[in-house]
């Protein structure tokens, strides 16, 4: 299923936020080392479903050290900005610790797939410009 950017369901938006946090951290890790380790977003997924607002704040705090690393990297900065935009879309009334429905997983997966397609397109464009 393709990413639905018009979906305003609370669980779906929180799922997209989780995918953004994961991607920003993963990108910063890749800049520092080739070692692939589990991101904070991946480790916190179970807690995220039960207490999404509190876990989002925790993940935001854990991303802070990575932000200086990605300062000049447009793709990752855009993903961080998307995360902030999605939090804003939730609004105060939906930014709560009420547990998420299963729809969060669809938002998470769809956003990750959109990032994957974006990465593949970017690689394809950079390869064709080198030729």
Could you describe each region identified by the protein language model?
Residues 1-131:
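Intrinsic-disorder/low-complexity detector
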């Amino acid at each position: 299923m393709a990413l639905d950017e018009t979906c305003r369901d609370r669980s779906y938006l929180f799922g997209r936020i989780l995918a953004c946090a994961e991607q920003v951290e993963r990108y910063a890790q890749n800049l520092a080392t080739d070692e692939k380790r589990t991101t904070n977003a991946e480790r916190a997924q179970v807690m995220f479903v039960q207490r999404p607002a509190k876990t989002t704040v925790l993940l935001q705090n854990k991303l802070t050290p990575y932000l200086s690393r990605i300062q000049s990297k447009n793709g990752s900065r855009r993903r961080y900005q998307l995360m902030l935009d999605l939090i804003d879309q939730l609004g105060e009334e939906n930014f709560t610790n009420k547990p998420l429905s299963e729809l969060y997983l669809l938002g998470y997966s769809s956003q990750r797939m959109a990032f994957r397609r974006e990465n593949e397109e970017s690689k394809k464009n950079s390869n064709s410009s080198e030729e």
